[in-house]
Amino acid sequence: MNIDLQKLIDILNELKTASISSTSDTIEATMKKYDMLFVGSEFNTIYSVELHHSINNIFNLKITMDELNSLLPTACNILNMGFEKMIAVNDIGKPNAAISYQITLWK
């Protein structure tokens, strides 16, 4: 892992700023820039699976999904960003089910 909590906070803040600045006319360019979806009526929601991809490939920082998942709740709490744990329907009830997060960058 070459990403720490502060780097993740910086990335989430950058994505928040990009989201706030985006309009329906510019969101496609924003999504291309970060190679991830910004969803919701205000383009303020992202998913940790895509965030993981963007961190590794756009920001050129290496982190595993497990490492990202361990940092996300703390980073989101510090930034007052909403987050919800997600588990695939076919994994519900399984021990050690893979998780991901839906992150609301701003409200």
Predicted regions mapped to residue ranges:
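Positively charged, polyanion-binding regions of nucleic-acid-associated proteins
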Residues: 1-49, 53-58, 70-77
